[in-house]
Amino acid sequence: MKTSIIPAIGKTALITSIFALIALNYGFKTEMSEQEWLNWSNKCLSNSFNPTPDINLKKWEITLTGDYFLRLRKTYQQGKQEYFSFNLHRLTNVDYLGSDTTGTLKFNTQTDDIIVQTYEDPEGNIDSMATSLGLPVHNMNTMRFDSLKIALNYFRMKSL
């Protein structure tokens, strides 16, 4: 009669260890998918945007699109709208000026690559281009800014 050289308890421990190693190996992803980066970036920008400096601001919308455009639309109480948009492959630098509680994200592009438009402005509609865009934010600590910068760089390199 053949008998195993591994006792029954040893077999159970060995099988359990193998399943644990398999679960550990396949349970963690090494990197986020593009959709996860996009969702996280939109959530970070939306949660961090600080509309309080514009007391007449009625509503706002900030979006990072799947085709690598960052878009900001502001609507004021009088009906005036401001619209800013640029493609991330034109982004050269992102800086953060401020503290952990409040500050400004400054986006810089290669040349006049940021679309600036106003609608229903009593002083006349504007359709121009800019090189930088300042975005007032709050609760932007160093780790969050670094993660956002990595995400934006990921999309910038992806769009090249």
Enumerate the language-model features and the residues they cover.
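Bacterial Sec-dependent N-terminal signal peptides
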Residues: 1-37
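C-terminal partner/receptor-binding element of secreted or periplasmic proteins
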Residues: 124-160
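A mature extracytoplasmic/lumenal domain signature
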Residues: 74-76, 87-92, 98-100, 109-113, ...
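Well-ordered beta-strand positions in beta-sheet-rich domains
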Residues: 83-88, 132-134
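N-terminal secretory signal peptides
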Residues: 28-85, 93-94
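Hydrophobic residues embedded in beta-strands of well-ordered beta-sheets
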Residues: 67-70, 101-105
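Sec/Tat-exported extracytoplasmic proteins
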Residues: 48-52, 92-98, 152-159
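Short, surface-exposed polybasic-and-hydrophobic patches located at secondary-structure transitions
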Residues: 102-122
